[in-house]
């Protein structure tokens, strides 16, 4: 079994080597690994580091984009998917790393459970002195193969794409690719992938170490960048509402539709309540105007509960004159 690791790189010269070596320090043979380092117009020495690593490990391919501006992780991941030939795809971020001691066990379990479409792991987030577990999916049954729709109906919450190891054939057969040009593309991709999966397995492996650095996207925002980050939720909801029209499962359709409407409500609340100096009155007006122009404000529902429905009405009344 071969694994394709797809790693977008953007100004990560300080962390890339640790990320890559966490793969090769595992028990996997190098012939069972291919690593795609996809540069996204880095302005530091990330490409130099990537090329040095490719000289050290024959299974690394460095992909450089012929553009002058940062296009985002979605574009880089889609480029990696075009080149990948492995049986499974494992997405990583270039400033994160794996617990090398667990990688071989994970691949062993993928084989043991008849190669499910998706094998999910958990993430350890390290932010300074704070450490917490993410993507644990407490509402979903673990250590048993499920249908994707059953995982969603039981309470699956899409999050980082680094938490789902996907069969390449499954991704290709369903034409699953990342929505380019938005934030929160992981959430949008993960929900569609799990919804379409015939078999998913949620493990207890805490194998992926997600680190927050001073240069992380979420910590280095201008007003323009903040707007891009915030409005991404709207595009995620719109995409999922379009997606549900393509599936025949009515119960699953309704669940995802309600869940996407909850995203829009949370977006509205976060903007309305924000004291962030970047999000002034004009910023907030722009968000709600954008939502209105896309037909999702005032909020309409359906929602996941009557309490949330009632809250949406209050939000509509309080925000409509912003």
What kind of feature is each model-predicted range?
Residues 2-4, 22, 34, 188:
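Cell-envelope/extracellular polymer assembly enzymes that use nucleotide-activated donors
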Residues 12-26:
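Short, well-formed alpha-helical segments that are part of the catalytic scaffolds
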Residues 22, 39-49, 67-69, 98:
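A conserved acidic beta->alpha catalytic loop
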Residues 32-41, 61-66, 94:
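Short beta-strand/loop segment that forms part of the nucleotide-sugar
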Residues 66-84:
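Glycine-rich, basic loop-to-helix element that forms the pyrophosphate-binding segment
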Residues 89:
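Short aromatic/hydrophobic "clamp" motif used to bind/position activated sugar donors
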Residues 271-322:
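Membrane-interface aromatic/basic loop that binds lipid-linked glycans or pyrophosphate carriers
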